[in-house]
Amino acid sequence: MSFWKNLFTSAFTPISAEADELIKEDRKQFEENTPSKKNFETQSPDEPSPKTTDSTGARDANLSLKTQEPIVSADDAKGAQGKGADEKEEKKETIQPPEEVKTEPPQPEEKEGKEAKEPEEPPKEEAEEPQEGGEEEEEEEEEEEITDPLEKMTQECMDAPDCKEVKHHFEECTARVTKKVEQGDKSEDCIEEFFHLYHCARDCADPKVFKVLV
């Protein structure tokens, strides 16, 4: 047991001594680099300030940058964004493409020539109108020439010997009624005598007209 104890102590004693020396050196270096509160109070203004580590320098630089940056509130940021959007819209409104000027192509001279020729057409229409009027006059003359054969033969039969007696009674009635009308008496008329004469003339004219048509 004592053998193993002596062996363990002889092996690890130098290592522990070296470790203690390293720890002491690191602590001494740390104390030299980090200034204490006592040093700041007792330090004279002529003495140089103790050295600071890189971490403390970086921290001081960040603090100085934060103090220099302006503090912008949320409302100010929104207002700045709104102003930027308004300025962009105004630029879009002001920058507009130039309006295209529509120019009508000049009309060809052929159309003018056609327009100049158009007034010459009405005389042709005027010349055609007299022809149409002449045709209508010819048709009217033909219609006037064509007479109803029944009326013609009925008139002839009234003067025929077969209807001579009936016609005589009609003429006497007509003369008598005319005198009464002149005196203001309208009590008599000759309608019955007229129909007797007309029927007599038709009885005479109808067979003759039938023969002509057949």
UniProtKB/Swiss-Prot annotation:
Region (Disordered): 25-157
Main location: mitochondrion
Locations listed in the record: Mitochondrion inner membrane
Disulfide bonds: 157-204, 173-190
Gene Ontology terms: cellular component: mitochondrial inner membrane; mitochondrion; respiratory chain complex III
Alphabetized UniProt keyword annotations: Disulfide bond, Electron transport, Membrane, Mitochondrion, Mitochondrion inner membrane, Respiratory chain, Transport
Biological process, per Gene Ontology: mitochondrial electron transport, ubiquinol to cytochrome c; proton transmembrane transport
Family assignment from sequence similarity: Belongs to the UQCRH/QCR6 family.
Subunit structure comment from the entry: Component of the ubiquinol-cytochrome c oxidoreductase (cytochrome b-c1 complex, complex III, CIII), a multisubunit enzyme composed of 3 respiratory subunits cytochrome b, cytochrome c1 and Rieske protein, 2 core protein subunits, and additional low-molecular weight protein subunits. The complex exists as an obligatory dimer and forms supercomplexes (SCs) in the inner mitochondrial membrane with cytochrome c oxidase (complex IV, CIV).
Protein name per UniProt: Cytochrome b-c1 complex subunit 6
Source species of the chain: Schizosaccharomyces pombe (strain 972 / ATCC 24843)
